[in-house]
Swiss-Prot record:
It comes from Oltmannsiellopsis viridis (Marine flagellate). This is Photosystem II reaction center protein H. It is a single-pass membrane protein. The chain crosses the membrane at residues 38-58. PSII is composed of 1 copy each of membrane proteins PsbA, PsbB, PsbC, PsbD, PsbE, PsbF, PsbH, PsbI, PsbJ, PsbK, PsbL, PsbM, PsbT, PsbX, PsbY, PsbZ, Psb30/Ycf12, at least 3 peripheral proteins of the oxygen-evolving complex and a large number of cofactors. It forms dimeric complexes.
């Protein structure tokens, strides 16, 4: 059964695993509140604006009507 307790194999302990263990010490911990969600949303919005600008340059869109573009 899924709820049944079983003996767990701890595996092989290596030097590399010991060195990398501190990187995984925060596993499962959640910061209270919104944390850095607002910062992430801001950067996502800025990235979306960047992508729109690149797309408009590629398509020679409305905002760039007066800018001459030539690939020759």
């Amino acid at each position: 059964m899924a709820t049944e307790k079983t003996a767990q194999d701890t595996g092989i302990e290596t030097a590399l695993g010991t060195l990398l263990r501190p990187l995984n010490s925060e596993y499962g911990k959640v910061a209270p509140g919104w944390g850095t969600t607002v910062l992430m949303g801001t950067f996502m919005a800025l990235f979306a604006v960047f992508l729109v600008i690149i797309l408009e340059i590629y398509n020679s869109s409305v905002l760039l009507e007066d800018v001459p573009m030539s690939w020759q």
